């Protein structure tokens, strides 16, 4: 299935049915009162997050989604039937944005999350509602309201703890296949990875994290070159980036120059993504003679000007991968605990306790260091 992470759709909720003006006419009630029923409600449209869907391809070809209108009311106090709602299933991680004003309508982050994106119109009132002590035979009725109509832009940002950065053929796909359950296409030519891949890394039965691999970046990516720039949005939700560098490239390519190009493109694309925690992973050590490894690593770090964490691995032989995975999980665990503490911290609101401000000179209060 083709990976699609953007789509534009139009959603049209159903109109409410019209109310009716009707009067009871029976054999022994020739002048019965009003009995016009209400119109049924129009169908609404909901977006539902589904973890079993991983692309927006269905919405690339089905651009319009319209719910049915509610039925009109009838006499004998018969109400019109309400139309069924429509539920559009989308991948977890989908952003739903109003295409006209850019308003973020919903961010689908959990499986089963359901969000109303177009509300159906309310049904109109029948004349039974307009009866009063001064108007015993009302002929008024109201029409159903129109359903909402919206043009939406859907953007998929995969949910992962770790994101992989690197040039084409840096070994990102080999790494993700070595440490997770993902099985991306691996070959010895550039741009083997054509769309993001997600893998679950299991440290133990109860400990795991999700890692995302995107197509490799090249110099000039922020200006449209290559494939990776269009997928960088998938790294915006990650907690940590792994910058994977090929330490033994072919054709005498300078790995320092390539690594600096990645950092440059990252900064040009998004400052927030550039500021995200980033670790340096030097790959393909199996292709470097053992007596040269230490010097090559030291020279690279010096020329690159790197001061952060550094890991030396061979994704092919899995050398160093286990230690890296352990370090990643420990880092992720600390981040998760910090987020949980933030969510649980009670927010103190002075107004809720009847205090607008505190005067240090007020004798009712004592400042404790």
UniProtKB/Swiss-Prot annotation:
It is an enzyme of class 3 (hydrolase). GO terms for cellular component: cytoplasm. InterPro entries: G_OBG, GTP-bd, GTP-bd_Obg/CgtA, GTP1-OBG_CS, GTP1_OBG_dom, GTP1_OBG_dom_sf, OBG_GTPase, P-loop_NTPase. Residues 1-159 form the Obg domain. Disulfide bonds: none annotated. One of its GO terms (molecular function) is magnesium ion binding. The keyword tRNA processing does not apply. Its cofactor is Mg(2+). Residues 160-333 form the OBG-type G domain. GTP binds at residues 166-173, 191-195, 213-216, 283-286, 314-316. Residues 128-148 are annotated as: Disordered. Mg(2+) binds at residues 173, 193. It holds the Pfam family MMR_HSR1. Transmembrane segments: none annotated. GO terms for biological process: ribosome biogenesis. Keywords: Cytoplasm, GTP-binding, Hydrolase, Magnesium, Metal-binding, Nucleotide-binding. HAMAP family: GTPase_Obg. PANTHER family: DEVELOPMENTALLY REGULATED GTP-BINDING PROTEIN-RELATED, MITOCHONDRIAL RIBOSOME-ASSOCIATED GTPASE 2. NCBIfam families: Obg_CgtA (TIGR02729), PRK12296.1 (NF008954), PRK12297.1 (NF008955), PRK12299.1 (NF008956). This is GTPase Obg. It comes from Janthinobacterium sp. (strain Marseille) (Minibacterium massiliensis). The gene is obg.
């Amino acid at each position: 299935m083709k990976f699609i992470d953007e789509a534009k759709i139009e959603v049209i909720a159903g109109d409410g049915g019209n109310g009716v003006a009707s009067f009871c006419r029976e054999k022994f009630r020739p002048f019965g009162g009003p009995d016009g029923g209400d119109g049924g409600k129009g169908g609404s449209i909901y977006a539902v997050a589904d973890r079993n869907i991983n692309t927006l391809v269905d919405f690339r070809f089905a651009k319009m989604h319209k719910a049915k209108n509610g039925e009109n009311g009838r006499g004998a106090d018969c109400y019109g039937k309400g139309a069924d709602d429509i539920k559009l299933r989308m991948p977890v991680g989908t952003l739903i944005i109003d295409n006209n004003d850019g308003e973020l309508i919903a961010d689908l982050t959990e499986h089963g999350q359901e969000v109303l994106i177009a509300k159906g119109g309310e049904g109109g009132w029948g004349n039974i509602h307009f009866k009063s002590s001064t108007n015993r035979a009302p002929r008024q009725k109201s029409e159903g309201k129109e359903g909402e109509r919206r043009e939406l832009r859907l953007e998929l940002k995969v949910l992962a703890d770790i994101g992989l950065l690197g040039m084409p053929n840096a070994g990102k796909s080999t790494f993700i296949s070595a440490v997770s359950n993902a099985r991306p296409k691996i070959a010895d030519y550039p741009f083997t990875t054509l769309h993001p891949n997600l893998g679950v890394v299991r440290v133990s039965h109860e400990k795991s994290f999700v890692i995302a691999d995107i197509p490799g970046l090249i110099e000039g990516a922020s200006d449209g070159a290559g494939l990776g720039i269009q997928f960088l949005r998938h790294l915006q939700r990650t907690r940590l980036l792994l910058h994977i560098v090929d330490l033994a490239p072919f054709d005498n390519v300078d790995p320092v120059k390539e690594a600096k190009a990645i950092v440059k493109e990252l900064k040009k694309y998004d400052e927030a993504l550039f500021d995200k925690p980033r670790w340096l992973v030097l790959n393909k050590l199996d292709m470097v003679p053992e007596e040269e490894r230490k010097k090559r690593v030291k020279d690279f770090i010096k020329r690159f000007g790197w001061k952060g964490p550094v890991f030396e691995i061979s994704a092919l032989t899995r050398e160093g991968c286990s230690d890296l995975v352990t370090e990643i999980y420990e880092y992720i665990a600390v981040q998760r605990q910090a987020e949980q503490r933030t969510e649980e911290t009670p927010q103190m609101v002075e107004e809720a306790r009847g205090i607008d401000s505190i005067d240090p000179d007020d004798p009712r209060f004592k400042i404790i260091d």
